[in-house]
């Protein structure tokens, strides 16, 4: 049995930026502190939502180190360190671990992709380079590559491969992973609209985009489930759905970064090629925030 890196709601946190595109560390610090005050169970820095794909390694490592130092062991800090180049990924994993991250979030190789055997070799090499627990990240809609349940089982045999963020949207696949891996691979939902379904299959929590705007909602949903109040967990899951729709009306993190600006945070804009949401989607986002009761009067 492997103890989970965290249990509950981990926020896939945005990276606030100044007008010139540089990282606004002061605002990142304020957002992190607000997350901790409102119940977030883990901070996931430099993931998809944090715009790691348009950061240099130096920027990514600086954001990881800043967050690790600020959080100071209050909750786990999980560092995005994925790459489609195994050698580069191993170097980034080692440097992220040296920054003090508690675990690594490693996405599947994208664009060049690989075979299932290649996934085993890639993730094994990166896990050993980092030397800290690894959460695999399966998001085939972005990468064009799916981690098959049988591959997840093979990877779960490695002592450092601790969990999987499952964002395939395929509940049947998640059930098969749970059946094959048991307690050797901790499952986290990668989709905010599937938190309770994955918890019902033995999942340990969620890596959440919605938590950026309403962390207590996602935390309380997970807590209710683990406390045995499944009716409350279900109700809170359903309460999330309008926010889920709004925050994924365009490719993540375009909507959530706009939402954070609406809420008064100095989130800034996304780096190109991501641009502002359309006017219609801005209205949808604002209406969802209003309905969720998070817009300050």
Where do the PLM segments sit?
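Active-site beta->alpha loop and helix N-cap motifs at the rims of alpha/beta catalytic domains
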Residues: 2-11, 15-144
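Short, amphipathic alpha-helical "lid/cap" segments that border enzyme active or binding sites
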Residues: 25, 29-32, 149, 282-289
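Catalytic alpha/beta core domains of metabolic enzymes, predominantly
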Residues: 128, 142-248
């Amino acid at each position: 049995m492997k103890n989970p890196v965290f249990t509950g709601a981990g926020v896939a946190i945005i990276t606030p930026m100044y007008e010139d595109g540089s990282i606004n560390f002061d605002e990142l610090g304020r957002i992190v502190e607000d997350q901790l005050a409102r119940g977030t169970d883990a901070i996931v820095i430099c993931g998809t939502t944090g715009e790691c794909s348009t950061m240099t390694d130096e920027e990514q490592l600086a954001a990881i180190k800043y967050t690790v130092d600020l959080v100071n062991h209050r909750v786990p800090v999980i560092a995005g360190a994925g790459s489609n180049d195994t050698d580069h990924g191993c170097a980034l994993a080692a440097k992220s671990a040296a920054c003090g991250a508690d675990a690594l979030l490693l996405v599947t190789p994208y664009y060049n992709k690989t075979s299932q055997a290649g996934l085993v070799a890639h993730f094994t090499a990166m896990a050993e380079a980092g030397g800290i627990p690894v959460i695999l990240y399966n998001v085939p809609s972005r990468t064009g590559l799916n981690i098959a349940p049988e591959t997840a089982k093979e990877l779960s045999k490695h002592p450092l491969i601790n969990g999987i963020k499952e964002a395939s949207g395929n509940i049947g696949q998640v059930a098969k992973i749970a059946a094959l891996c048991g307690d050797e691979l901790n499952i986290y939902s990668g989709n905010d609209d599937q938190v309770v379904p994955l918890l019902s299959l033995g999942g340990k929590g969620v890596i959440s985009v919605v938590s950026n705007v309403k962390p207590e909602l996602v935390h309380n949903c997970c807590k209710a489930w683990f406390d045995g109040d499944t009716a409350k967990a279900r109700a809170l899951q359903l309460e999330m759905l309008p926010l889920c729709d709004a925050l994924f009306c365009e490719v993540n993190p375009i909507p959530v970064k706009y939402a954070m600006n609406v809420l008064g945070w100095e989130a800034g804009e996304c780096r190109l090629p991501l641009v502002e949401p359309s006017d219609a989607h801005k209205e949808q986002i604002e209406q969802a925030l209003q309905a969720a009761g998070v817009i300050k009067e």
